[in-house]
């Protein structure tokens, strides 16, 4: 199977891992971002996604799927949707578990108000989720991963722990040390994005994607 895919974002961490998977399966990939870090083997579209006029200069091309990896708030979601949804056969939006309100035990009914400790990031992503879920158009799939790790991570997360461990420095534990978190390897997220893009007749359109293991 092959097709024409548009990736919004795509220049850091998640994008390159997902694009490599698409290229291995012979998809034609266009990448839309500010163009500061071109992705080899793709068609580069340059626009600031906050600029509706700049985005709409790239409208009108049919895509088998639009994969939105770089949306952080409702205005960005709206500009992208209004620009590309009419020409897309499917829309995959990368969200985050940070959209969930603080609950003792997660449930299918958990709201997307975002816990206070996520600050503006969680609130912005929750608003973007609410926007795309309220639209009619191509089939929509939303993935909500937890903390990501793996090669080319630009966030100083696992490297911080390894540096301290190798140097024999103490590693601070947030809070009282009882909080449980889950992680997801970047290649597993790339696979999940691909399945969200290609799987037909899904029963649900919002999925939490995480590793099985919980840790403090």
Give short role names for the model-derived ranges.
Residues 5-25:
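N-terminal Rossmann NAD(P)H-binding glycine-rich loop of SDR-like oxidoreductase domains
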Residues 8, 32, 69, 94-96, ...:
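SDR active-site strand-loop-helix element
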Residues 32-36, 48-49:
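N-terminal Rossmann-fold cofactor-binding loop
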Residues 41-51, 70-72:
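Rossmann-fold cofactor-recognition segment
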Residues 52-61:
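Short amphipathic alpha-helix with an adjacent loop that forms part of the alpha/beta core around
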Residues 61-112, 116, 123-131:
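NAD(P)-cofactor binding segment of oxidoreductase domains
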Residues 129-152:
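Conserved beta-loop-beta element that borders a ligand/cofactor-binding pocket
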Residues 162-172, 179-214:
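Alpha-helical substrate-binding/gating segment
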């Amino acid at each position: 199977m092959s097709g024409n895919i548009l990736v919004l974002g795509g220049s850091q961490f998640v994008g390159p891992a997902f694009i490599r998977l698409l290229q291995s399966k012979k998809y034609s990939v266009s990448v839309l971002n500010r163009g500061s870090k071109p992705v080899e083997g793709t068609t580069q579209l340059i626009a600031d996604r906050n600029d509706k006029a700049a985005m709409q200069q790239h409208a009108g091309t049919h895509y088998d799927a639009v994969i939105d990896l770089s949306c952080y708030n409702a205005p960005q979601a709206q500009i992208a949707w209004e620009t590309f949804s009419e020409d897309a056969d499917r829309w995959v939006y990368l969200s985050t578990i940070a959209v969930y309100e603080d609950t003792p035990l997660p449930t299918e009914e958990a709201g997307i108000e975002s816990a206070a400790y996520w600050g503006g990031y969680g609130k912005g992503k929750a608003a973007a989720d609410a926007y795309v879920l309220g639209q009619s158009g191509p089939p929509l799939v939303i993935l909500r991963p937890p903390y990501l790790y793996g090669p080319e991570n630009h966030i100083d997360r696992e490297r911080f722990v390894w540096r301290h461990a190798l140097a024999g420095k103490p590693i601070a534990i947030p809070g009282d040390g009882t909080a449980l978190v889950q992680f997801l390897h970047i290649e597993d997220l790339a696979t999940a994005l691909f399945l969200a893009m290609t799987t037909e007749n899904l029963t649900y359109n919002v999925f939490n994607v995480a590793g099985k293991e919980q840790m403090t």
